[in-house]
């Protein structure tokens, strides 16, 4: 017997699947087989918890729990192969593999049970019928008739679904699905329509209704007079087009060149959604330095002046909790506060999320980026002025927030578009035009040259930036001097030459402190204005042959800007009154 046991163990070892590398695909496996194999391998190594939610021993619904992350997912087992099973985890929803580590873990546990081989050989044959969503290459609705399915329902299903392809619903028959669901629900037969399938159907219906409603509201499209009167300032034609595009898409990426007015397009879309599509809560997420800029422009463009029209979220946790409890139309927060405030945001439940300066989140695997993807909303508008076509990893992550299914699974996209050397190092990208076509339904991007004829000769834009605590100290110190001199002047009706000089100097110092403390002490550099300026350069210089001219009254302002340009490796020339006349022609 001992010899027999050793022989069985030896045979088991020989038949064990080889360990797969997570970074290099085996030559004898396709990318799909490799990715499925990785999930099978990883799932069977886990120590998850498993709970059967029904009395069925194999073809049942289970709860798979991960004690490490304290997360749990619903798993439905319908067979051994990919496609028919289901898991509520994000990987299953987006990988297009028809499996995940939770499904593979569950299968591994079930296969060890007595009767598993016979049960899986017989296959899944439930008494009830079900409508479900499959995502093994493309998301599609499927129908599976139960053993007790009435003949009338079977006949209706045969006319609607392609029973030769696992009950798949053809694209041209989605408009007939609602009546079928109604019929099945009233048949007296147990009919299950799962949430993910119903959500998918609802999303398609909502898109159709939005398009129909927009055509009714603005029959002339971007040229419709109703759009020109939408805000307190008239929209340029391309801005009206962008606003309509964002509303029609529901979740959209606006990637126009810097300076073309992405903010006003987002506010216009926000107004359309609020007036005609039931949006009552809007969350704006932007860099800290732009929060008050957003508040100012929402009030200016929309004409709303009440306190709850646009509230900036500031302060400690207690203050932010109080702010999120208030019944505001719009709340404005910054990236750094997303993770600690996720529970507050979820409780407030925004209908629309606007994400500004998305390109500033350089690493979309950061805490803030992961937190952003956990915010749930019916509508979303992402604004970025930087071209992302050649930054594939950043583009993937941004698009995942807008529409996690649009680009397909990351593993597949990188396999199709990354160019690697023999060592597996990424050396470039290929086929990027195909990505642009895939993104067309959710992404709009106009270059300045394309809309130049619609623009005035000059566009003025004032950007508000906050002052640091040290800047405020210098500013207030000089403001106190000004107040004392003015008070004495009003009292005596006389201003001495000394006081005139002190007054002028203090006012000048107040202005200089708004740039940076460096202008006053030549030692410290407290201030965000120069950093914001160079951040704008990052966007501007992403375009070839772009140039910028910066004017300042003070050469010390030039000095702090130059330091930042040199740190980024950006070329520049500096022209001021101290440049000798013989060197000026070269500049």
Positions of PLM-derived features:
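Conserved helix/coil segment N-terminal to the catalytic DExD/H
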Residues: 275, 317-352, 363-367
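Hydrophobic anchor at the beta1->P-loop junction of P-loop NTPases
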Residues: 89, 254, 550
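Conserved P-loop NTPase motor "coupling/switch" region that bridges the ATPase
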Residues: 275, 279-281, 296, 300, ...
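Conserved SF1/SF2 helicase motif Ia
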Residues: 253-260, 265-297, 379, 544
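Conserved Helicase C-terminal RecA-like lobe
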Residues: 227, 265-281, 453-480, 490-587
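Conserved helicase motor
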Residues: 311-320, 335-340, 360-366, 554-556, ...
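Charged, low-complexity
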Residues: 2-5, 28-30, 54, 117-252, ...
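Short Cys/His-based metal-binding microdomains
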Residues: 69-122
């Amino acid at each position: 017997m001992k010899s027999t046991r050793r022989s069985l163990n030896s045979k088991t070892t020989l038949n064990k699947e080889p360990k797969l590398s997570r970074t290099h695909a085996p030559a004898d496996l396709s990318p799909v087989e490799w990715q499925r194999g990785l999930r099978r391998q990883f799932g069977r190594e886990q120590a998850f918890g498993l709970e059967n939610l029904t009395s069925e021993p194999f073809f049942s619904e289970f709860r798979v729990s991960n004690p490490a992350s304290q997360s749990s997912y619903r798993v439905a087992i319908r067979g051994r192969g990919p496609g028919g099973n289901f898991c509520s985890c994000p990987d299953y929803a987006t990988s297009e593999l028809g499996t995940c580590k939770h499904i593979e873990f569950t299968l591994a546990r079930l296969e060890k049970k007595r009767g598993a081989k016979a049960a899986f050989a017989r296959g899944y044959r439930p008494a009830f019928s079900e409508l479900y969503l499959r995502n093994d290459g493309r998301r599609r609705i499927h129908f599976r008739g139960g053993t007790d399915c009435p003949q009338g329902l079977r006949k209706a299903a045969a006319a609607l679904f392609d029973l030769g392809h696992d009950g798949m619903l053809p694209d041209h028959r989605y408009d007939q699905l609602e009546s079928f669901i109604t019929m099945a629900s009233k048949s007296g037969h147990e009919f299950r329509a799962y949430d993910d399938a119903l959500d998918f159907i609802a999303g398609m219906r909502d898109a159709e209704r939005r398009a129909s409603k927009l055509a009714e509201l603005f029959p002339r499209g971007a040229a419709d007079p109703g759009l020109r009167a939408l805000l307190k300032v008239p929209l340029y034609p391309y801005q009206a087009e962008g606003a309509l595009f964002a509303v029609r898409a529901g979740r959209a990426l606006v990637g126009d060149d810097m300076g073309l007015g992405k903010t006003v397009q987002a506010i216009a879309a926000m107004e359309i959604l609020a007036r005609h599509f039931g949006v009552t809560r809007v969350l704006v997420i932007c860099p800290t330095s732009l929060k008050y800029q957003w508040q100012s422009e929402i009030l200016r463009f929309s004409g709303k002046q009440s306190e709850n029209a646009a509230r900036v979220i500031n302060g400690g946790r207690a203050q932010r909790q109080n702010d999120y409890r208030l019944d505001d139309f719009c709340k404005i927060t910054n990236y750094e506060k997303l993770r600690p405030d996720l529970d507050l945001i979820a409780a407030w439940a925004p209908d629309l999320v606007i994400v500004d300066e998305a390109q500033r989140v350089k690493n979309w695997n950061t805490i803030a980026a992961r937190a952003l993807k956990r915010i749930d909303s019916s509508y979303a508008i992402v604004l970025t002025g930087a071209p992302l076509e050649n930054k594939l990893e950043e583009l993937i992550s941004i698009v995942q927030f807008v529409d996690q299914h649009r680009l397909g699974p990351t593993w597949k996209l990188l396999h199709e578009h990354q160019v690697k050397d023999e060592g597996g190092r990424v050396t470039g990208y290929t086929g990027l035009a195909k990505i642009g076509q895939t993104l067309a339904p959710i992404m709009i991007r106009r270059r300045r040259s394309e809309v130049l004829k619609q623009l005035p000769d000059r566009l003025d834009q004032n950007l508000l930036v906050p002052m640091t605590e040290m800047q405020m100290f210098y500013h207030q110190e000089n403001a106190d001097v000004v107040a004392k001199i003015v008070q004495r002047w009003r009292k005596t009706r006389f201003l001495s030459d000394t006081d005139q000089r002190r007054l002028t100097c203090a006012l000048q110092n107040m202005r200089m402190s708004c740039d940076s403390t460096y202008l006053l002490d030549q030692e410290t550099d407290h201030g965000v204005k120069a950093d914001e300026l160079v951040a704008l350069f990052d966007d501007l210089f992403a375009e070839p042959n772009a140039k910028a001219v910066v004017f300042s009254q003070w050469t010390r302002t030039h000095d702090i800007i130059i330091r930042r340009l040199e740190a980024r490796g950006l070329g520049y020339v500096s022209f001021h009154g101290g440049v000798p006349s013989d060197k000026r022609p070269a500049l």
